[in-house]
Amino acid sequence: VVVQLLQVAGALRFPIDELVEIAARALSPGVNDPFTAIACIDWLCAALIDLARMPQRPAVLRDEEGIARVVQRRLGLSDFLRAAVGQLAPYAVKDPNAGAHLVRTLETICASLSDPDQRAQVKAEHDRVARKLASMRRR
């Protein structure tokens, strides 16, 4: 059962990690392809909105008698934000177009969410990236 749960979590994280990797490589000095990075950011935006809107299943699974049998650690929006934005931001803020697009994307995600906790998580990530982008522009 544990392996199966890890596979599900990995299945959700894998495409995020791949898109981040593609975007980071596209922003490398040797490639310098912000268009590809921006396309990856758009795909990440769509994925994060979909993941945020997924209904949360109970973290405790019970048997027929109501006895708790499995307690699962749930991946939440903050985990996916960290995987996507947290890993990509250091590369994106070095490119003005990609950095600005990432900030706008976080605004789009925030505007699409109704849950106040999720909005706060995205807003915090937005503010962090916007600060980094502003500090890069001052250099």
Predicted region positions:
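Short basic (Lys/Arg) and small-residue
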Residues: 1-139
